[in-house]
Amino acid sequence: MNLFRFLGDLSHLLAIILLLLKIWKSRSCAGISGKSQVLFAVVFTARYLDLFTNYISLYNTCMKVVYIACSFTTVWLIYSKFKATYDGNHDTFRVEFLVVPTAILAFLVNHDFTPLEILWTFSIYLESVAILPQLFMVSKTGEAETITSHYLFALGVYRTLYLFNWIWRYHFEGFFDLIAIVAGLVQTVLYCDFFYLYITKVLKGKKLSLPA
C-alpha cells in the first residue's frame, strides 16, 4: 500500500467519524442528506460482498467492516434515532436518476461479467455521484454547518488522494484501472466548486453557502 492510498483511507475515515460525531453530539441530523447516506450504504454493501470470500489483509478486512457498519449506523441515526430532526423537505434529489443509470452502466462497462464484478463496478460508478443529494440539499438551504463542511471537505480530499494513488500505482506497478480513474475524476470534479468555497469561506471562519 502506498502513502496516497493510506492517507486517502484516513481522510475517508475522518469524514465518516466527523459525520457520526456531528449527529450524535448535536442529537440532530439537520443539514445531512439521508439520501446520500443511503447511497453510500448501498455503495459499501455492493462493493464489499466479497468480505467473506476474498481475504487480502487484516487492514483491508477491518476497513471493509468499518465502512459498512458506519454507513448503516449513519442511516439508522437519520431515519430512526433522530428522525424528528431530519429535513426531508430539502432532501428532495431524485436518487433514481443516479441509481438506474449507474446500474445499467455497470452491466455494460465492467472488467468481467460476473455478479461480484458487476456489483463492484456499480459501487464505483454510484460512489462517484452519491454526494450529489448532499450538495443539492446544501444548495437548496443556502448554507451548511461548519462541521458538515469539514465532512464534505474530508470526503473530497479522500477522492483526490485516491487519484494520486492510481497515478502512483500506474507509475510504479504498471497497474491501470480506467473505470476507477474515470469515476474518481468525476467525483473530484463535483467537489471542485465546494473546495473553492471551503477555502475562501470556511477556513476564514465564515459559513459555507452554495449558489441556489
Curated annotation (Swiss-Prot):
PROSITE patterns: ER_LUMEN_RECEPTOR_1, ER_LUMEN_RECEPTOR_2. Residues 25-32, 80-92, 136-149, 200-212 are cytoplasmic. The chain crosses the membrane at residues 5-24, 33-52, 59-79, 93-110, 117-135, 150-168, 179-199. One of its GO terms (molecular function) is ER retention sequence binding. It is found in: Golgi apparatus membrane; Cytoplasmic vesicle, COPI-coated vesicle membrane; Endoplasmic reticulum membrane; Endoplasmic reticulum-Golgi intermediate compartment membrane. The record marks 5, 117 as: Interaction with the K-D-E-L motif on target proteins. Residues 1-4, 53-58, 111-116, 169-178 are lumenal. The keyword Cell wall biogenesis/degradation does not apply. The record marks 193 as: Important for recycling of cargo proteins with the sequence motif K-D-E-L from the Golgi to the endoplasmic reticulum. One of its GO terms (biological process) is protein retention in ER lumen. Residues 204-207 are annotated as: Important for recycling of cargo proteins with the sequence motif K-D-E-L from the Golgi to the endoplasmic reticulum. Binds the C-terminal sequence motif K-D-E-L in a hydrophilic cavity between the transmembrane domains. This triggers a conformation change that exposes a Lys-rich patch on the cytosolic surface of the protein. This patch mediates recycling from the Golgi to the endoplasmic reticulum, probably via COPI vesicles. Belongs to the ERD2 family. This is ER lumen protein-retaining receptor 1. The lineage of its organism: Eukaryota, Metazoa, Chordata, Craniata, Vertebrata.
